[in-house]
Curated annotation (Swiss-Prot):
UniProt name for this protein: Ig kappa chain V-III region PC 7043
Region feature (Complementarity-determining-2): 54-60
Region (Framework-3): 61-92
Stretches for region Framework-4: 102-111
GO cellular component: immunoglobulin complex
PANTHER family (UniProt xref): IMMUNOGLOBULIN LIGHT CHAIN (PTHR23267)
Source organism (scientific name): Mus musculus
Region called Framework-2, residue ranges: 39-53
Source taxonomy: Eukaryota, Metazoa, Chordata, Craniata, Vertebrata
Region (Complementarity-determining-1) residue spans: 24-38
Length: 111
């Protein structure tokens, strides 16, 4: 299985500043020119919400302050400017190889 290592495990960012979350895959998640890495946001008591798919594509209805980048094994989620409602746990997920796997999560606190 592909192992996804997220960092940091938690971070605290001031309102209006930038949050950066990294995800490193144990092997490439690229196929035929696309990177099969997705990012989810989860708040307590709610199911995960898809933010970014295929590394850099913003899901419909998600604010443009969320952005994703990367390819191969190294990926990044940026949130800028951070808003209070962004406090949540964020997960990367690869969908290149079955079983699809998730990172261990990054908890974002807004200061």
């Amino acid at each position: 299985d592909i192992v996804l290592t997220q960092s940091p495990a938690s971070l605290a960012v001031s309102l209006g500043q930038r949050a950066t979350i990294s995800c490193k895959a144990s092997q490439s998640v690229d196929y035929d020119g696309d990177s099969y890495m997705n990012w989810y946001q989860q708040k307590p008591g709610q199911p995960p919400k898809l933010l970014i798919y295929a590394a850099s594509n913003l899901e419909s209805g998600i604010p443009a302050r969320f952005s994703g980048s990367g390819s191969g094994t190294d990926f990044t989620l940026n949130i800028h400017p951070v808003e209070e409602e962004d406090a949540a746990t964020y997960y990367c997920q690869q969908s290149n190889e079955d079983p699809f796997t998730f990172g261990s999560g990054t908890k974002l606190e807004i200061k």
